[in-house]
Amino acid sequence: MRERLLAAERVKAIEWRDGTLRLLDQRLLPQEEVWLDHGSAAEVAKAIRDMVVRGAPAIGISAAYGIVLGARARLARGGDWRTALEEDFRLLADSRPTAVNLFWALNRMRERLERMKEGDRPLAVLEAEAISIHDSDREANLTMAQLGMELIRKQQSSPQNILTHCNTGALATGGFGTALGVIRAAHLEGLVNRIHADETRPWLQGSRLTAWELANEGIPVSLNVDSAAAHLMKTENITWVIVGADRITANGDVANKIGTYQLAVNAMHHGVRFMVVAPSSTIDMNLESGEDIPIEERDGRELLEIGGRRVAAEVDAYNPVFDVTPADLIDAIVTERGVVERPDAERMAALMSRKRLH
């Protein structure tokens, strides 16, 4: 499966080339494919905040490279560069509040910094750590793709209709994807009849990104408005809802793109299985439950305007980016460490005590 997935890879969103972070501007897809070069921590933080790059794993990877860029600038200026670098850590940490992968990656970069020995070359050490974070995410995605595909096949070996939300593919990760990685593997195994992709308002990650990724690989995909999901579950023989995650708490609650919670409620009502696919870096064992997760809200103009023109009356807008799905609505959480079925605090703790499978 690994070799087949590698051979099928066609999309990527992050490149580290000659000391520059190159990001595919996802705001312009699918009409334009524009790569932007980033040479400083401040530029990377702005790219994360402005959603040039999005998806929890991709944000974390980008932030790690941002620290490398920050260190390069601080070292060039001389003086107490380590203390000065803390400003870059703070700047990147403040770029998006909900995706825990961001903080995980920054903490890993800080820990590597603290472990440096006399004679180490700081920039080379930090660059190697950022590349390791990037590479390990790709490996995690390959492992999760296999595990998730096996869950699908275990339930039903014939081609199935699957519903997904937002974008969880190569564009959102270091490669292949989380939920879309599972879907890719299932397609290669002949387990996919059709993918139904929610358009995912207001940024339309489903219609702009997910549909684009799947169509590029020849995977049958139909786009639907978000509010059609329950109707699809009732009428189109959906067997799985498969989504990613931006943060998973110690009890198995999941924060993900707004609209995920209602998908889980509808899935339970219709007897549709619900799978969450995310690397273990998304799991925050310091938070007891989803009640503790900070939920980002974005500018209401994202709802009130189209193309910069106001289309709604002079009203306020409520624009949360994420919601929290309780663990008791989730059939399985798939990570590179293994699978947790019917997640709860005890099972999540057992998962996190395991070694990685890749």
Curated annotation (Swiss-Prot):
| Pfam families the UniProt entry points to | IF-2B
Q: Which reaction does it catalyse?
A: 5-(methylsulfanyl)-alpha-D-ribose 1-phosphate = 5-(methylsulfanyl)-D-ribulose 1-phosphate
Write down the position(s) of the site called Transition state stabilizer.
Answer: C166
Q: Does the keyword Cell wall biogenesis/degradation apply?
A: no
Which Gene Ontology BP annotations are present? L-methionine salvage from methylthioadenosine
Per UniProt, which keywords does this protein have?
Amino-acid biosynthesis, Isomerase, Methionine biosynthesis
Q: List the EC numbers from the record.
A: 5.3.1.23
Q: Which GO terms describe its molecular function?
A: S-methyl-5-thioribose-1-phosphate isomerase activity
| Lineage top rank: taxon | Bacteria
> What positions constitute the catalytic site?
D246
State where substrate binds.
R54, G55, A56, R96, Q205, N256, K257
Q: What metabolic or biological pathway is this protein involved in?
A: Amino-acid biosynthesis; L-methionine biosynthesis via salvage pathway; L-methionine from S-methyl-5-thio-alpha-D-ribose 1-phosphate: step 1/6
Q: Which family does it belong to?
A: Belongs to the eIF-2B alpha/beta/delta subunits family. MtnA subfamily.
Task: Read off the HAMAP family from this record.
Answer: Salvage_MtnA (MF_01678)
The record's function comment reads:
Catalyzes the interconversion of methylthioribose-1-phosphate (MTR-1-P) into methylthioribulose-1-phosphate (MTRu-1-P).
PANTHER family xrefs? METHYLTHIORIBOSE-1-PHOSPHATE ISOMERASE (PTHR43475:SF1)
In Swiss-Prot or TrEMBL terms, this protein is called Methylthioribose-1-phosphate isomerase
